[in-house]
């Protein structure tokens, strides 16, 4: 089932999410619904807060980035094979010199800005079968994980922008929160005027 994606301005996107356990109600159904929702919106990642749930879970499938001609074959292969669910993740290390990449977000449609992040991460997490993993990622794979991880920390990519950039997109963000935007996927807007 396709769920509505929560738009910029909803408080759930600014809350630090809570861990879940194996008994979380209808977890398998939620995971399947989130995959459907992400693919329906042509996303490469989706975090539980983006569907209104302040829990520490996200999923990624960065395969569309593998079409980038500038990437080497090894990085393309990583991106093609990286369809994963991350439950209760913790980034335990971020290293390397920060680099910029134009990021977007399903909760903030039609806004893309350069965000600086470190290129290498080590992350601990449980998969959907509750197997524990500790893995290291680099480049675009790391960036997609960092972006989704920020969601469960209550951080949006717009929070990482300079004050000037924030001022330049302020009215665009206000319009998104009010639902004054056309999107091809289902969304829930926190400040939309209710019809009488």
Curated annotation (Swiss-Prot):
Keywords associated with the record: Hydrolase, Iron, Metal-binding, Protein biosynthesis
The keyword Glycoprotein belongs to this UniProt entry's keyword annotation: no
Cofactors: Fe(2+)
Gene3D superfamilies: Peptide deformylase
MF terms (GO), sorted A to Z: metal ion binding; peptide deformylase activity
Record bears the keyword Transport: no
Source organism, top-level taxon: Bacteria
This enzyme's EC code(s): 3.5.1.88
One Gene Ontology biological process: translation
SUPFAM superfamilies according to UniProt: Peptide deformylase
Cross-referenced Pfam families: Pep_deformylase
Cofactor binding annotation: Binds 1 Fe(2+) ion.
Active site: 148
Catalyzed reactions per annotation: N-terminal N-formyl-L-methionyl-[peptide] + H2O = N-terminal L-methionyl-[peptide] + formate
Binding site for Fe cation: 105, 147, 151
EC top class, as a word: hydrolase
Cited function: Removes the formyl group from the N-terminal Met of newly synthesized proteins. Requires at least a dipeptide for an efficient rate of reaction. N-terminal L-methionine is a prerequisite for activity but the enzyme has broad specificity at other positions.
Family according to the record: Belongs to the polypeptide deformylase family.
Name listed for the protein in its UniProt record: Peptide deformylase
